[in-house]
Amino acid sequence: LLSAAEITVHHAASSSVLELFYCRNGRVGWNMRGGTAVYLGAGDLTAHSSACCADSAMMFPLGYAEGISLSIDLPVLDANCPEILKESGLDLPTIQSTFCGEKPVAIPACPELEGIFAPLYSAPSFRRRAYLQLKIQELLLYLSDVEPEKHALTQYGSQQTELIKEI
């Protein structure tokens, strides 16, 4: 649970580390590098390289956001990929080229995302780690099939968002 009006994010930038943020509750406005802004509501997911959010600011219009944040080093995963994902034909270089470009991809709430993330919140605490490992694999399979251009939320330039905030 992130509880604040705004936070700044500073970390190492890498075009091969996939950053994922699932917003379960609340709202997030995220100003990223290159002047791109993403807005997430309950059930939305953003996927981008850590280079996009290395120096960024997250705003919480409702004063909070609850969700799950994941960082996946794709070359490390590729070298240590679970056999079941290899057998499924999971193509990590394609995931990297699709989601680790210069701009983030925001996917709106949908039954598939709800099905992936909901069990993480309802599982008994002693099973959460196992569920998390399974659900990350399921999320990677989902991302390998999703076509961002058909599902993506609208992105805004940070100048547009500043103008909206002034109004």
Task: Walk through the language-model features, giving the residues of each.
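Generic alpha-helical structural element
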Residues: 66-70, 102-105, 121, 128-129, ...
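A short, Lys/Arg-enriched amphipathic alpha-helix from helix-turn-helix/homeodomain DNA-binding modules
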Residues: 106-121, 133-167
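Short, solvent-exposed positions on alpha-helices
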Residues: 126-134
